[in-house]
């Protein structure tokens, strides 16, 4: 836990370090509890643990510090598999993500990415944060943007 002014306590020192290291265009995966984080991270991304933390809480905290990309899609989710599409499965957590992204200045759109393509994209991410999120299809990728000079300290 980090106890600093203005830094949400859900952001660990390891996660803060990774956020600071990331550059424009680097991607961060916020992985749900069922995501194969350790397997994916064997391919290169840094593995960060946030066990027990729900993604909306973590996303809200991250977006206080993390500029979203405005030149390209800023967020992506794992698309439903065909059988879940046929069932008409709803994914209410996506609405929460969209609202948080809008509050951070994004249009709130999230590109749906086919399941196995999502895994491959995650292997190229800068880091994967393993969370305690239990919602189905809770995985989210966010892309880092730039901080304009007038917003820099």
Curated annotation (Swiss-Prot):
Q: Which InterPro entries match?
A: RbsD-like_sf (IPR023750), RbsD/FucU_mutarotase (IPR050443), RbsD_FucU (IPR007721)
Under SUPFAM superfamilies, the record lists: RbsD-like (SSF102546)
Enzyme Commission number(s): 5.1.3.29
Q: Which Pfam families match?
A: RbsD_FucU
- Which residues catalyse the reaction? 24, 69, 119
Question: Could you tell me the superkingdom of the organism this chain comes from?
Answer: Eukaryota
Q: Does the keyword Translocase apply?
A: no
Tell me the keywords, alphabetical order: Isomerase
Quote the catalytic activity from the record: alpha-L-fucose = beta-L-fucose
| GO terms for MF | fucose binding; L-fucose mutarotase activity; racemase and epimerase activity, acting on carbohydrates and derivatives
Residues that hold substrate according to the record = 32, 78, 119, 137, 139
Q: What class of enzyme is it?
A: isomerase
Function, as annotated, reads:
Involved in the interconversion between alpha- and beta-L-fucoses.
Of which family is this protein a member? Belongs to the RbsD / FucU family.
Name of protein: Fucose mutarotase
Taxonomy of the source species: Eukaryota, Metazoa, Chordata, Craniata, Vertebrata
